[in-house]
């Protein structure tokens, strides 16, 4: 007795559903990391926009600008984007704070910093976790990890490879 099978059996359909589920389980976290990295790139872009003003201030005055106003840039809350709440200049360190809404949960309210050090007559910039410089007129340009930002550091996997410098870099 030969019967002609038409369509899919229940087992075949279950296997297809299992494969789709596995693919979704792998793809979804990868996509979330991708969106977080894209949102962090906005913070880096906005922070990098302040580098020239900070460098110019340093070259003209011999010390780091103490705040946004002395650096000649807009106030920290005026420098913002879709995913960035503010960009603050403090003692020559530029710190971007991610927004607390409409942003990936893993980076909500988190921070990253850009800071400069003198090197052979020029200024070299670094990028990484939040740091602070205690004095504008420091002679060694040392920065240290910002302990007030504990729990507010962006996970390294969301930072571009060019933005993973440590506070001791340089």
UniProtKB/Swiss-Prot annotation:
Glycans are attached at residue 70. Major component of the type IV pilus (T4P) that plays a role in cellular adherence, microcolony formation as well as twitching motility. The modification N-methylphenylalanine is found at residue 8. The gene is pilE. It comes from Neisseria meningitidis serogroup A / serotype 4A (strain DSM 15465 / Z2491). Pfam families: N_methyl, Pilin. It is found in: Fimbrium; Membrane. This is Fimbrial protein. Residues 1-7 form a propeptide.
